[in-house]
Swiss-Prot record:
Keywords assigned by UniProt, alphabetized: DNA damage, DNA recombination, DNA repair, Endonuclease, Hydrolase, Metal-binding, Nuclease, Nucleus, Zinc, Zinc-finger
GIY-YIG domain: residues covered: 12-95
Role according to the record: Catalytic subunit of the SLX1-SLX4 structure-specific endonuclease that resolves DNA secondary structures generated during DNA repair and recombination. Has endonuclease activity towards branched DNA substrates, introducing single-strand cuts in duplex DNA close to junctions with ss-DNA.
Highest taxon in the source lineage: Eukaryota
Record gene name: SLX1
One function term, GO molecular function aspect: 5'-flap endonuclease activity
Protein name: Structure-specific endonuclease subunit SLX1
Taxonomy of the source species: Eukaryota, Fungi, Dikarya, Ascomycota, Saccharomycotina
Disulfide topology: none
Amino acid sequence: MGDDIGTAGVPAFYCCYLLRSIPKRLSYYIGSTPNPVRRLRQHNGLLTKGGAYRTKRQGTRPWELAASVSGFPSKIAALQFEHAWQHPYQTRFIKSEDRIVKKKGGGRSIHQRLAVLKLLLHHPFFKVMSLVVHLFSEDIQRVWFLDKYKLEAPFIHVEVDEDALSEPTGEDEESVIEHAKKNLRLVELFYGRSLKEDSECLEEYRRRLQNGAMRCAICEKIVDYVKDSDSFSSEKELVAFCYNSVCDYFSCLSCLYNVFASDEELRTGEIPLIPTSGQCPNCNIELSWARIVRYSMFLSA
């Protein structure tokens, strides 16, 4: 899986990100990309193609990628999140009474930028996407968990990089460049892991589907991707796998949807239009509905 838009319009990877200037620590930039490694290199002038004009300001380079939000089901969804994060004073994804930033030009502190991120993750439109926040810097992690505006919630999935960087060792050019190189390496490892995990899951699912007829664990319908591939007129059934590597659960996607929706109704008293998560009927681990759907779309394309 590369960094381009995948089949069925589903991106292999897409994230929104927060950059911070290494020499000017109070300068930030918010953007989005299907490839954070390439984009960070563009921002730092290591690649000349691809724009990144707004991060060319005098004295701000190099930049570090401080935080990312990934798991978007489409480029459009990521761009909507990016725009809302950049314009928190007017976005429809934050209620007027909940706004932390109330006017243009406000919200410049790191506390406010991360608080806006949390507010967006609270909105139902983004909440069902099961987005993942990744933090690359120790001080950014401290600000996140300090939670100045008390917006932390159990449904927000945040990953802390084990090798997160501390502050640059000095203000001289050598220290700044070394810090930028270490940050780029962290982003490379993160991006590589993300693509590898999805690629390995999809490879295993395709291998199982190549065996031919498979029976839905819920309705017992027979699904045969080999047979469907030979028929130009037949649309493939959307299917669901458990992404626990030791679980062999398989069903129609619609059947698992009914299970997740029913379980969520029991927990909340409301019937969800789109469930956020649910337990695998076979191994009982918690599964992200958005992730299951994304894999299903790739497999059927």
